[in-house]
């Protein structure tokens, strides 16, 4: 659970050969949940760091819980699976498995958090109106 208001800067899934999907989800203090990022075609030999654009970096209030969920494919249909007949547990070797997400965060003061939320709300309102201030159709 986040102790302070937070801006999520990036998300880098890390799994090994059987890794398939990884998702990071926020559970807000009011109970609402939201998927922040989901990588559906994880490639174990191409670990990508997904850096959020400034206007899209998730802003999370204090008390938010982050949940990382990972899916692995240990079937014979997975071309990256060295041996689908083997039970696989956690381990550091590439032929073992693991799942964790590397993320960077910036902790914000409550005032900075509220100001950034207000700035983004103003940007959204401006984008939803046309050049003359009338709504786009």
Residue ranges and their predicted role:
Residues 1-127, 136-137:
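His-enriched metal-coordination microenvironments in redox/metal-binding proteins
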């Amino acid at each position: 659970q986040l102790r302070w208001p937070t801006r999520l800067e990036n998300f880098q899934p890390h799994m090994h050969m059987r890794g398939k999907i990884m998702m990071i989800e926020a559970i807000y203090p009011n109970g609402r949940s939201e998927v922040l990022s989901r990588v559906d075609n994880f490639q174990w030999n191409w670990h990508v760091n997904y850096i959020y654009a400034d206007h899209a970096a998730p802003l999370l209030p204090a008390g938010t819980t982050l949940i990382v969920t990972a899916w692995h494919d240990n079937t014979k249909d997975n071309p990256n699976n060295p041996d689908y007949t083997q039970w696989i547990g956690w381990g550091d070797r590439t032929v073992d498995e693991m799942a964790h997400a590397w993320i960077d965060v910036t902790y914000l003061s409550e005032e900075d958090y509220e100001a950034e939320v207000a700035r983004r709300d103003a940007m959204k309102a401006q984008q939803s109106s046309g050049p003359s201030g009338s709504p786009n159709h």
